[in-house]
């Protein structure tokens, strides 16, 4: 027996709120974090994807964090020095726009404030948001090192960002160029290609007449953007298009400026689109821009950075783009230059952050050359040193995306973020790039722009581990858990920087989560109003129930449907675990448990449950190590609920034989179950462990998962006995027979080698209110037919009354119909090509197993039906 003090305040009923208030692990976790941070070997580390300081965490964050917390606890229990690196992201554009919205809503102006004052105000605002996030982490029970928390805009991060920028500039990987970029008019900032979301939009296709110089003849041009005609540089036709062969190298008149523009030929033009004549406006279209460079055309924009027309839109200046389009169309129509208008579907780019239409804009920006390192990432993923993706399909997506990747535009016209470490000399074109200001700083002006937030986020694995003492042990981290939506934004950039700076991968495994959808399989969104606040779920069911639901519903890369009934069911499981623990404790008051001393006189029933546990534990480990949480947790959930609680505990309640072996097994298994479920349900398991009479550690986190397998556990007829009990329970349930009624049965053994009616079999059946009676059964029909025995219920008429034969036959027929429908459903799933191609292997195997069980059940029922005829 342990000398460690127990908490004797365990309430009779499970109350998640009390359980969470009495969580005793904060101190242990704090001490373990200090110890694990200093460890130089047997380390296991995870980097928390830093949440944006823009608001509260949603269910996706809860899923992502719960998976990581589960892995950290699991590996601590395995004896590794598991450490979870945490922090938050300043999230440049997202945070600045959220803050400016807050200012507008509260009628606060910061126009007269300096840049430093604005940054200080936003930093304070972000700290308040950060406090809310921190509280949510704690509400979820996350095993984070709160004393070593990081921020992507902290001093250490800024130093790292500046050092890397300077190094990349000196290595020729960063350059400045005036070029066509994606411009967010709402932000008045450049954004990168992957921050542009393409959406299909119905718009007008305008057919406009471009008259030839000194001629009444004209070419018809189809365009969706008449407001850019002012800066058309030429018309382009395909040299293979016979319709326009005679027009090449002639001149047409710009319908809005009356200036001459040349007609040129290039195979880029799609003969089938519109009229086959294309207007080329290099400053307002990326494809036109490439043609402009090819033919050395002028590249002039008729838009200002705020989305209004400029002086090149002669007669239409200072109009918003949408208004300019209307005015231009009116002018063209009035002057008989508009021939017709058709509806068409266009792929329009929208800002991922502001949802504003993105405009191509000529602008001087900073870029990172990515082609060299994108090739290195592809080469890496083809080598033995590759990062393993779960599921692997996302590795293929990443590689496909990295082929022919454009350079990364890293400058943003914002004030919240890492200011670019570049100074321009006032009286010359000299540029100074450095981690510190130049000498004679007053002669220079610093670049006002900040870096794309993904620059500091891409350095996150290096910044956070370099900031810690045991950086070599923590880098690379073991696994990154992240959503598929930021593979290109973040995962690639971490790989890029790690290969560039460390010449190794930033993490060994990459687990990709799917989306969380509502119970109708709709994506959760504010517009649909179907979002779920994790705080509300925790308030109602507790963090453990939410965590268990999320983990037991998770497969790599698969979407997860939030169903409240399933969370409620998880609460029900935890409640059952609580009651089972109390039963074991109450019955062990006079018992001395020694885990290392397995009783020599274990009964077959004890061996059966220990074998069941060994199998469930082994299968759990096998699947858990592949990140198949849905399958792995189901193994131990089913064991705990069905085998341990509903079978072993229930049948042990009336057991009188061999109490020592029974109590040893009960205590052994309840302890192992608590340890196994701790990574999923830390609050309830730590609370129960604190009250475990025979605990040997101060904390459940100090226990170990390396369970020693108990050998020599051969047992004979227990599965058959339990099958008999199950049949009788079903019989009682279907016929509404009270549980306290004794059922008299006769067992006709068909295979004595496989099934024997021993004293233990009789005792187990007796505990289930089943009495074995020997009787001549020649004139009787069996109620249940099994492979090894027949079951005859002898007191059926007393229990049901007469005339029940027809009812029994009808019930069997209904059950046959149900089983056939289930077999048909399984066949449908297994013949579905999409399911076979996309579903995890474990799900397919599970469906095959279900089908096999249903087919066996059908044979059994058909045999039973024939015996009643």
Swiss-Prot record:
Its main location: cytoplasm. It catalyses: tRNA(Val) + L-valine + ATP = L-valyl-tRNA(Val) + AMP + diphosphate. ATP binds at residue 526. It is found in: Cytoplasm. InterPro entries: aa-tRNA-synth_I_CS, aa-tRNA-synth_Ia, Anticodon_Ia_Val, M/V/L/I-tRNA-synth_anticd-bd, Rossmann-like_a/b/a_fold, tRNA-bd_arm, tRNAsynth_Ia_anticodon-bd, Val-tRNA_synth_C_sf. One of its GO terms (molecular function) is aminoacyl-tRNA deacylase activity. A motif ('HIGH' region) lies at residues 51-61. Signal peptide: none annotated. Keywords: Aminoacyl-tRNA synthetase, ATP-binding, Coiled coil, Cytoplasm, Ligase, Nucleotide-binding, Protein biosynthesis. Its EC number is 6.1.1.9. One of its GO terms (biological process) is valyl-tRNA aminoacylation. GO terms for cellular component: cytosol. This is Valine--tRNA ligase. It comes from Malacoplasma penetrans (strain HF-2) (Mycoplasma penetrans). The gene is valS.
């Amino acid at each position: 027996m342990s000398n460690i003090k127990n908490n004797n305040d365990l309430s009779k009923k499970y109350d998640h709120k009390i359980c969470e208030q009495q969580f005793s692990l904060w101190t242990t976790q704090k001490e373990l974090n200090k110890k694990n941070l200093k460890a130089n070997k047997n380390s296991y580390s995870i980097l928390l994807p830093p949440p944006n300081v823009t608001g509260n965490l949603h269910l996706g964050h809860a899923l992502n964090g719960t998976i990581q917390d589960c892995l950290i606890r699991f590996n601590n229990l395995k004896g590794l020095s598991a450490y979870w690196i945490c922090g938050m992201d300043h999230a440049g554009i997202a945070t600045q726009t959220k803050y400016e919205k807050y200012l507008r809503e509260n009628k606060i102006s910061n126009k007269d404030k300096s840049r430093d004052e604005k940054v200080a105000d936003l930093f304070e605002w972000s700290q308040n948001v950060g406090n809310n996030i921190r509280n949510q982490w704690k509400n979820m029970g996350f095993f984070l090192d709160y004393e070593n928390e990081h921020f992507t805009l902290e001093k250490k991060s800024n130093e790292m960002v500046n050092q890397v920028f300077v190094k990349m500039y000196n290595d020729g990987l960063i350059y400045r160029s005036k070029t066509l970029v994606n411009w967010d008019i709402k932000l008045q900032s450049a954004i990168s290609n992957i921050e542009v979301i393409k959406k299909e939009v119905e718009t007008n296709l305008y057919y406009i007449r471009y008259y030839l110089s000194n001629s009444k003849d004209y070419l018809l041009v189809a365009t969706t953007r008449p407001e850019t005609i002012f800066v058309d540089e030429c018309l382009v036709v395909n040299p293979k298009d016979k319709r326009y062969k005679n027009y090449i190298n002639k001149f047409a008149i710009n319908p809005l400026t009356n200036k001459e523009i040349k007609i040129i030929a290039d195979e880029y033009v799609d003969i089938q689109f519109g009229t086959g004549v294309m207007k080329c406006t290099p400053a307002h279209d990326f494809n036109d821009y490439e043609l402009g460079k090819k033919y050395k055309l002028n590249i002039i924009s008729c838009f200002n950075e705020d989305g209004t027309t400029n002086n090149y839109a002669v007669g239409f200046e200072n109009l918003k783009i949408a208004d300019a389009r209307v005015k231009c169309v009116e002018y063209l129509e009035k002057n008989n230059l508009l021939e017709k208008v058709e509806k068409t579907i266009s792929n329009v780019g929208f800002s991922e952050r502001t949802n504003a239409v993105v405009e191509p804009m000529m602008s001087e920006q900073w870029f990172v050359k990515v082609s060299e390192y994108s090739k290195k990432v592809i080469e890496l993923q083809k080598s033995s040193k590759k990062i393993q993706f779960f599921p692997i399909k996302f590795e293929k997506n990443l590689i496909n995306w990295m082929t022919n990747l454009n350079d990364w535009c890293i400058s943003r016209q914002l004030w919240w973020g890492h200011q670019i470490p570049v100074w321009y000399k006032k009286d010359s074109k000299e540029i100074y790039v450095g981690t510190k200001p130049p000498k004679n700083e007053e002669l220079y002006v610093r670049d006002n722009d900040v870096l794309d937030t993904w620059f500091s986020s891409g350095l996150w694995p290096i910044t956070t581990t370099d900031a810690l003492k045991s950086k070599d042990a923590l880098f690379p981290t073991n696994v990154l858990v992240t959503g598929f939506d930021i593979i290109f934004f973040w995962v690639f950039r971490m790989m890029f920087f790690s290969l560039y700076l460390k010449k190794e991968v930033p993490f060994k495994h990459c687990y990709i989560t799917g989306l969380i959808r509502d119970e109708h399989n709709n994506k959760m969104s504010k517009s649909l109003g179907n979002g779920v606040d994790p705080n509300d779920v925790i308030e109602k069911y507790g963090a453990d129930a939410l965590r268990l639901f999320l983990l037991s519903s998770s497969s790599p890369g698969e979407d997860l449907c939030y169903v409240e009934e399933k969370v409620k069911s998880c609460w029900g499981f935890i409640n059952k675990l609580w009651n089972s623990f109390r039963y074991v404790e109450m019955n062990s008051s006079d018992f001395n448990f020694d885990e290392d001393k397995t009783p020599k006189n274990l009964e077959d029933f004890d061996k059966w449950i220990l074998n069941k546990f060994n199998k469930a534990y082994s299968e759990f480990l096998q699947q858990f190590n592949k990140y198949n949480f849905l399958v792995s947790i189901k193994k131990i959930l089913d064991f705990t609920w069905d085998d341990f609680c509903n079978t072993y505990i229930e049948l042990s309640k009336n057991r009188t034989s061999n109490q020592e072996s029974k109590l040893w097994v009960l205590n052994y298994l309840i302890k192992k179950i608590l340890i196994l479920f701790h990574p999923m349900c830390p609050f309830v398991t730590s609370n129960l462990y604190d009250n475990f009479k025979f605990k040997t550690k101060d904390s459940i986190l100090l226990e170990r998962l390396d369970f020693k397998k108990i050998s020599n556990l051969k047992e004979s007829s227990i599965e058959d006995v339990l099958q008999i009990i199950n049949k009788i329970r079903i019989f009682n349930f279907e016929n509404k027979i009270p549980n306290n009624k004794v059922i008299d049965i006769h067992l006709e053994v068909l295979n004595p080698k496989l099934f024997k009616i021993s004293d233990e079999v009789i005792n187990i059946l007796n505990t289930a209110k089943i009495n074995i009676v020997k009787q001549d059964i020649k004139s009787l029909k069996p109620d249940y037919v099994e492979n090894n025995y027949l079951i005859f219920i002898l007191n059926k008429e007393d229990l049901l009354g007469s005339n029940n034969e027809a009812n029994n036959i009808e019930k069997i027929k209904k059950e046959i119909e149900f089983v056939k429908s289930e077999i048909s459903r399984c066949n449908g799933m297994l013949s579905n090509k999409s399911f076979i191609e996309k579903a995890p292997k474990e799900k397919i195997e599970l469906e095959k197993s279900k089908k096999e069980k249903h087919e066996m059940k059908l044979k059994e029922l058909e045999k039973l039906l024939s015996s009643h005829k």
